[in-house]
Curated annotation (Swiss-Prot):
Its main location: cytoplasm. Substrate binds at D21, F22, N23, R36, H59, L60, G61, R62, R118, R151. GO terms for molecular function: ADP binding; ATP binding; phosphoglycerate kinase activity. It holds the Pfam family PGK. It catalyses: (2R)-3-phosphoglycerate + ATP = (2R)-3-phospho-glyceroyl phosphate + ADP. ATP binds at K201, G293, E324, G353, G354, D355, S356. This is Phosphoglycerate kinase. InterPro entries: Phosphoglycerate_kinase, Phosphoglycerate_kinase_CS, Phosphoglycerate_kinase_N, Phosphoglycerate_kinase_sf. Keywords: ATP-binding, Cytoplasm, Glycolysis, Kinase, Nucleotide-binding, Transferase. Pathway: Carbohydrate degradation; glycolysis; pyruvate from D-glyceraldehyde 3-phosphate: step 2/5. One of its GO terms (cellular component) is cytosol. Monomer. Belongs to the phosphoglycerate kinase family.
Length: 400
């Protein structure tokens, strides 16, 4: 890893301002899923053990350009205190006298959390005045928020113009696994792409046609490919304006010798809800009017397993069906379990964040993959081969 991390700097007695990703679901003032807080614990604990004073910054939700009590990060501070087993001081502000006083009183090994970074509209504009205010509170910046790495905001990118920025453990792990998967994967390298829209994945498919040995398509975007193959898709979700593009991608894959695997059957229903009548239609026969596909069918599951069997590196981004409804979760679950079983055989298995990470945890498989990314949009842009601003802003290691 070519970036400086918290291991590379002296933290004793330093004021450390740390950008974490505590964008967690909250109901009635209580955190309902603390996964993201738990994932930041190793970084926070390490920095505290080194004798630093820690100031935490995070966003939560999408407040409309100003403070909104619904999006306060106070419940996240309370949950963190329980997990750490120590007090987490909370100031309901982002800068100003109250914040400066709290920072001045902070002792080594203590934690202070500031309010939701997005309560200041400058955050998402990468306002440098705002970044300067935060930088003035600390000696060093720790970036452990991979989930926002594809965004240039004041709290992760702007601040690095004024004080040195280093990676936390979570950020380091994300970069390590995703870099390996995108830059020098052990081959055969197989990518599984699901989700509803081809348009969301065009950049990824185009970039991976130069890197992957096989690309497996699933989720509703498979129907745009079925249409490109001249097949009927009934009432399934199809991006009409992307059918020609799907044809081009099929052609490009052929030219580059990359196997683009399209599911051969689908589990269909007349309504997207649990307990309705379901039928399996094949790509060849097509899906009749009034029916729509909501999952890959049994033949597709076997086809996909056979294409994954010899892989040495697997990256999976996007569910293969509407996994939130049990009737249509079978394809995603079967493929997730199969990929998980390959991890034990020494295959590097990486799950992109977002819906695929949610699916993996719904099936209780999150410990069974080499790496489950914490960033949906960020992992997608990483796979597109883009440089992410929130990684570029972290200081580079000096070449020895």
């Amino acid at each position: 890893m070519e970036k400086l991390t918290i291991r590379d700097v002296d933290l004793k007695g330093k004021r450390v301002i740390m950008r974490v990703d505590f964008n967690v679901p909250i109901k009635d003032g209580v955190v309902t899923d603390d996964t993201r807080i738990v994932e930041a614990l190793p970084t926070i604990k390490y920095v505290l053990e080194q004798g630093a004073k820690v100031i935490l910054l995070t966003h939560l939700g999408r407040p409309k350009g100003g403070p909104d009590p619904k999006y306060t990060v106070k419940p996240a501070a309370e949950r963190l205190a329980q997990l750490l087993g120590k007090e987490v001081k909370f100031v309901p502000a982002l800068y100003g006298e109250e914040v400066e006083k709290a920072v001045a009183e902070l002792k080594e090994g203590e934690v202070l959390m500031l309010e939701n970074t997005r309560f200041d509209p400058g955050e998402e504009k990468n306002d440098l005045e705002l970044a300067k205010k935060w930088a003035s509170l600390a000696d060093i910046h720790v970036n452990d928020a991979f989930g926002t790495a594809h965004r240039a905001h004041s709290s992760n990118v702007g601040i690095a113009q004024y004080i040195p920025s280093v990676a936390g453990f979570l950020m380091e792990k994300e970069i390590k696994f995703l870099s390996k998967a995108t830059h020098n994967p052990d081959k055969p390298y197989v990518v599984v792409l699901g989700g509803a829209k081809v348009s969301d994945k065009i950049g990824v498919i185009t970039n991976l046609l130069n890197k992957a040995d096989k690309i497996i398509i699933g989720g509703a975007m498979m129907f745009t490919f079925w249409r490109a193959l001249g097949k009927q898709t009934g009432n399934s979700l199809v991006e009409e304006d992307k059918i020609d593009l799907a044809k081009q991608l099929l052609e490009q894959a052929k030219e580059k010798g990359v196997e683009l695997v399209i599911p051969t059957d689908a589990v269909c229903a007349q309504k997207m809800e649990a307990g309705v009548e379901k039928k399996v239609f094949t790509c060849e026969e097509g899906i009749p009017e009034g029916w729509a596909g909501y999952d890959i069918g049994p033949a597709s599951i076997e086809l996909i397993k056979s294409k994954l069997a010899d892989a040495k590196t697997i990256v999976w981004n996007g569910p293969l069906g509407v996994f939130e409804i049990e009737d249509f979760a079978n394809g995603t679950k079967a493929v997730a379990e199969f990929i998980a079983s390959l991890t034990d055989k020494g295959v590097t298995t990486v799950v992109g964040g977002g819906d695929s990470a949610a699916a993996v945890s719904q099936f209780g498989l999150e410990k069974k993959f080499s790496h489950v990314s914490t960033g949906g949009g960020a992992s997608l842009e990483f796979l597109e081969g883009k440089e992410l601003p929130g990684i570029a802003s972290i200081a580079d290691k000096k070449k020895q």
